[in-house]
Design a protein with these regions (language model features):
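Non-catalytic terminal extensions of ATP-dependent helicases
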Residues: 1-119
Length: 119
């Protein structure tokens, strides 16, 4: 699972990275349903501090899914291999690269430079 703040930086979501609750409802603890949704979608729920942050995370996850962008788990895995700007990758591109790495016994394919690779 992915830390929500790391995820915010990976997808360049400044509003999420610097989130501060404004309204009283945002300051309440996140609901069990919100935390379950976040965990199911790859976010580490124990570090979600309140209902407002959970709502914003869920909104970002849904928007990114509609846009066909990489998931939190895909982003984290590919960043571990040294790829950059993975938060901008399409789901399909991330999936294909993960398959290539998996087919290569979880090593980067020879000749592939993760730091400069663009899908």
């Amino acid at each position: 699972l992915v830390d929500p703040i790391q995820y915010a930086f990976s997808i360049s979501a400044d509003d999420l990275a610097n989130y501060e609750p404004t309204f009283a409802w945002e300051m309440a603890p996140a609901s069990p349903k919100q935390l379950e949704y976040l965990e199911k979608h790859g976010i580490f729920p124990e570090t979600v501090t309140n209902c407002g942050m959970a709502s914003l995370l869920i909104e970002k996850l849904k928007d990114r899914q509609i846009e066909g962008l990489a998931t939190p788990k895909q982003i984290r895995l590919l960043e571990r291999y040294g790829f950059t700007h993975v938060g901008l990758w399409m789901f399909e591109s991330a999936s294909k690269m993960i398959t290539r790495i998996a087919n290569n016994n979880w090593f980067l394919p020879r000749g592939l430079d993760a730091k400069t690779y663009q899908p």
